[in-house]
Amino acid sequence: MNRCPACGKTYGDEARFCTRDGSKLVVVADKGATRETVAGRAEPPSAVTHANLVGRVLDGRYRIERKVGEGGMSFVYLAKDIASDEQYAIKVLSAALSSDANAMARLRREASLGMRLAHPNVCHIIRLGETPDGLVYVVMPYVEGEVLSDRNNRLGTIPIADVVHYVRDIAAGLHVAHELKIVHRDLKPENVMICAGPSGTERAVVMDFGLAKERRADAELQKLTATGIILGTPEFMSPEQLRGRPLDPRTDVYSLALMTYEMLTGKLPFSGRTQQEMMIARLRSDPMPLRDAMPGLGLEAVERVLQKAMQRDPGDRYQTAPEFATALAAASKVDGEEKSRLGRFFAR
């Protein structure tokens, strides 16, 4: 039998993590149990392989329906609650990550906080569990919609009114996390879902708080991420992230500003032949002005807001995500009024 050292809840021998707070369970010896048998129960399986989980029931509750995505570090499945028929997303971590003690310690710590992220603009963690063959999984609400990166690729650029709306939603979700001392660290378009909101509106939902980060890295950068020097996605990382310095909410503000720039122009504000060159540019160069990336866009006030949000020194940026979102909305209104004024002038 295993027990949570934090809340005292007991579990069977196969469980490793508390479903309430994510704490690692400790083994409680049965009467007559030897030191060897108790120690043996605490050991993870010696050989863990990632088999197809479709059709299996996890935790006696979640039936795996189909695989909906995968990355180098995880597989994502659609699952249904066998009692309520409600849909969930289950992210199953790779065997290598599931057996990595440091990664699991970080995941347990952040999952315990992530379970408290109840907000319409956040896909929060419901529970942390483990399959009988030793694979760690995370249960989340199933959010149906279009990934922001797919939306941007499909449209090329996104209208400023929609961008302001998405940024406001993302900032609201980030702020709740930041109040709990959680920094996303890997905010990017692939981690935002655009789904149906109330009364026919759209809602942006931030995904993957506290989870293992997927990486889009070239060979040079993979050497750094493999050592744990860098945690995040290179294209959207802040300068302090690249330098390996302590992170705070202003890191997510920087990443959100890069996402905003890409939504408006279809481009990133720093260029380079490799991701490493792009990283160096972020440390040494100023971002490309919005007017150069998209001539004729006519968003001078928005450009000034983005320039501030993308400052290399965190102290020179907007200090919170809502502050950035509010400034962006106000700048968009100023630019809209200026366009209307010019339109009336040239119509004379």
Where are the regions that the model predicts?
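Activation segment of protein kinases
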Residues: 49, 98-101, 195-239, 243
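C-terminal lobe helix-coil module of Hanks-type protein kinase domains
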Residues: 80, 174, 233-340
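AlphaC helix of the eukaryotic protein kinase fold
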Residues: 94-116
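A short, aromatic-enriched beta-strand patch in the conserved N-lobe beta-sheet
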Residues: 127-129
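Conserved short submotifs of the Hanks-type protein kinase catalytic core
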Residues: 133-147
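AlphaC helix of the protein kinase catalytic domain
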Residues: 147-158
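Activation segment signature within eukaryotic-like protein kinase domains
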Residues: 166-167
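Protein kinase catalytic-loop region centered on the HRD/HxD motif
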Residues: 171-182
